[in-house]
Amino acid sequence: MAKKIVGYVKLQIPAGKANPSPPVGPALGQRGLNIMQFCKEFNAATQAMEPGMPVPVVITAYADRTFSFITKTPPNTYFLLKAAKVQKGSPTVGKSAAVGRVTMSQLREIAETKFQDMNANDIDGAVRMLAGSAKSMGLTVVEG
């Protein structure tokens, strides 16, 4: 018989840097889960990733106070800012000059990485979604 699920916890934690301090500790403590065990397992699962990369994680809490978790790919904004080599997007999109630029080939690479977590039917659709995200962040999309 399957375990009874009592809830889900969605967090975004830097790769390899999970620790019991907020936001991890309070979120898991409310569900009665072993915080240190999660931190050890998460850090082990993300040690191959670039340190500090934001990793979305969905933690499933069970009635017997055990858990399982699924890591997802980092957010689109992380990849777009990294491709454009900028720290953050434009605070006033459309009013000021673009803060950076990304090429269509960079968008295609990001789309291939993110495709499993995106709500798109094909790679071209995912590229268009990323182009829209880039424009809303104040990045210019160029051919190439």
Curated annotation (Swiss-Prot):
Domain of life: Bacteria
InterPro entries: Ribosomal_uL11, Ribosomal_uL11_bac-typ, Ribosomal_uL11_C, Ribosomal_uL11_C_sf, Ribosomal_uL11_CS, Ribosomal_uL11_N, Ribosomal_uL11_N_sf
GO CC terms: cytosolic large ribosomal subunit
GO molecular function: large ribosomal subunit rRNA binding; structural constituent of ribosome
Signal peptide range in chain numbering: none
GO terms, biological process: translation
Keyword rRNA-binding: yes
Gene3D superfamilies: Ribosomal protein L11, C-terminal domain, Ribosomal protein L11/L12, N-terminal domain
Pfam families: Ribosomal_L11, Ribosomal_L11_N
Post-translational modification remark: One or more lysine residues are methylated.
Keywords assigned: Methylation, Ribonucleoprotein, Ribosomal protein, RNA-binding, rRNA-binding
Keyword Transport: no
Role: Forms part of the ribosomal stalk which helps the ribosome interact with GTP-bound translation factors.
Protein family membership: Belongs to the universal ribosomal protein uL11 family.
NCBIfam families (UniProt xref): L11_bact
Assembly, per entry: Part of the ribosomal stalk of the 50S ribosomal subunit. Interacts with L10 and the large rRNA to form the base of the stalk. L10 forms an elongated spine to which L12 dimers bind in a sequential fashion forming a multimeric L10(L12)X complex.
Name of the protein described by the UniProt record: Large ribosomal subunit protein uL11
Gene (UniProt): rplK
